[in-house]
Amino acid sequence: RCYLLSRQYHYPYWEANSLQAISEHLQNDDDRHRLTADNLQEIDFVNVDQMPDSLLSGNLAQRALTLFEAYGDVYQTSGAWRTLSTSYRNIGDYNSAYACLTNALEKDTAINAAPDLVASIREQMSIVCSAMGDKQRSDYNRNIYLDLQERTRQDRQLEARAEQLSFSLRQLDFMIVAVIVLIA
């Protein structure tokens, strides 16, 4: 429904999001067979290039990527590269999967401001390198992923602590005002 409405009313951002979400749901063989059987007419509608079922996920991910690039959303574009990479990985094309992940990291370095996104890309790079039998690159990417996860966890802990301190400060301010009012 979201895809249909976004196409009808020319909302490329939502069209791309819809295509990417459908692509992600079609990546698992069992899910793809069930979704295709249950939604044949809808699948035929989004399958404008008449791709075989096994390649439809990649086609939809590529179309989402093209739309996100045209829209100019760096973070969504990186996510679309990651989705396309997973589609390639699922059909055994590990070199293309790795190239997609490299593009996700290198096309626009602004994504480095989103460590969770970079961490998920590095995690996928580690998986792809492992599938290619490249232990050294797999370990390298896994270590970056783990470092980013640890840093992100520490950042969240610090943010939670700062919020607690801010709350305590507001309580103390209130108590000081109450004491001053009682004294006066």
Indicate residue ranges for each PLM-predicted region.
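Conserved binding/catalytic microenvironments
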Residues: R1, A16, D30
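N-terminal pre-first-transmembrane soluble regions of secretory-pathway and organelle membrane proteins
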Residues: R1-H10
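Hydrophobic positions within repeat-based interaction scaffolds
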Residues: L4, H25-N39, I43, M51-G58, ...
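Alpha-helix N-cap/helix-start positions at coil->helix boundaries
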Residues: P12-Y13, V74
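Phosphate/NTP-binding elements of NTP-utilizing enzymes
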Residues: V48
